[in-house]
Amino acid sequence: MNNNKTPDLLKVIVAGALVLLVVHTLGRFIYTPLLPLLIQDGVLTVKQGADVASWNYLGYLTGAVLAMRWHRIEQIRSVLPWALGINVLCTLLQTQTENFELLSFLRLANGISNGIVFVQAPALILEWLARHGRASASGLVYLGVGGGLIVSSGLVSLPADFLSGAQRWWPAFLLSVP
C-alpha cells in the first residue's frame, strides 16, 4: 500500500463515518432511548411517540427514494451538504419545541434528510474508494453508525437527571455541529 494514500483514505472513511453518526445515530436512532424520557416528561403520550416515530420512518423512506433520483456524483456533491445541514437544523429545532405537530414535522424532515444522506454519503465514498483501488474498505464507513449507537446511549443517560423535555435533544445537537 502506498503510504501517501493512507491519510486520504483515513480522512474519507472518518468523514463518512462522522456524517452517518450525525444523521443516522444522532438524527434517527437517538429517539429510541429518548422516547421513554419524553413520555415521562409529559412531552408525548405513548401513542404520540409512536406517531412521531412513524413520521420519521416515512421521511427516511422518502429520502432514500429521493436519493436514487439524485444519483450522479455531481448531484450527490450538490445535494449531500444541504441534506446534512437540514438534518442538523431539525435536531436544533427539536430542542425548542414540545409541540406534537411541530415535532412530527421535524421528525419527518429529519427522516427525509437522513434517508438522502444515508444513501448518498456511502455512494460518494464508494466512488472515491473504487477510483483509488480501495473498494474493500467501503464497509468501514458504517462504523459511524455502530459507534454512534454507543455514543447516543450516553448522550441520553448521562444528562437524564438534569435535562427535561425538549432540552433532552441538546446533547445530540451539540455533537452534530462540526
Go through the PLM ranges and name each one.
Residues C90, E101-A109:
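Paired small-residue
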Residues T25, F29, G111-V119, I150:
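Small-residue-rich segments within alpha-helical transmembrane domains of MFS-like 12-TM solute carriers
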Residues L106-L143:
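Cytoplasmic helix-loop-helix junction between adjacent transmembrane helices
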Residues V43, Q96-E101:
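Helix-breaking motifs and short loop linkers at transmembrane-helix boundaries and internal kinks
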Residues L9-I30:
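Pair of pore-lining "gating" transmembrane helices in MFS-fold secondary transporters
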Residues G133, L140-P178:
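Helix-loop-helix hairpin linking two adjacent transmembrane segments in secondary transporters
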Residues N56-L58, G146-G147:
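Short hydrophobic/small-residue motifs within alpha-helical transmembrane segments
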Residues T62-E98:
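Conserved MFS/SLC helix-loop-helix module at the cytosolic interface between two early adjacent transmembrane helices
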